[in-house]
């Protein structure tokens, strides 16, 4: 009887610990993205960017990229805080580092000057079709629409981020996309990137 109670308590504590770890990852991932949405790029990168990624693309360069993307006069770009679909913790540490995969969806809106400032309806429609095709090829056919009312492309993206932590408290995040696999392999374990193949 004591053995059964011990096993039940041990199982319960393992499940509770795993759930709390997932909650920490979710909260920190949402905080990271909230900082990006608020355009506090420097703080987002200081707190949550993977050090290995910043060796390839320094923080200052990333801040410039974010600034350019969000302040480009030829387009208005906005992101919403993502919706976390699932967090999968990697079962064992790799070189004393804990890993998890965060699967999420995120909506973004893009207003392009080429569409808004088109000289006539024909040019506007041509530009809409051009950009719509480009967005659909990148994000998938059913994930992009053009909203005539506000002249914006509305995009729903589905992505994966890799979370890593040395001690399980402070997590760092790297958005992992298929076209970046070779770069990501430079600082993330290959087995973590299997979902991108």
Please give the residue ranges for each predicted region.
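Short, aromatic-enriched amphipathic alpha-helices that serve as compact interaction elements
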Residues: 21-39
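Short, compositionally biased low-complexity segments
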Residues: 3, 36-43
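Hydrophobic, Leu/Ile/Phe/Ala-enriched alpha-helical segments that form helix-helix packing faces
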Residues: 33-36, 66-73, 135, 163
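Short solvent-exposed beta->alpha transition segments
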Residues: 26, 42-99, 103-104, 110-112
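Charge-rich, solvent-exposed alpha-helical interaction surfaces
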Residues: 28, 65, 131-134
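Bacterial Sec-dependent N-terminal signal peptides
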Residues: 1-24
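Short low-complexity stretches enriched in small and charged residues
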Residues: 20, 54-64, 118, 126-130
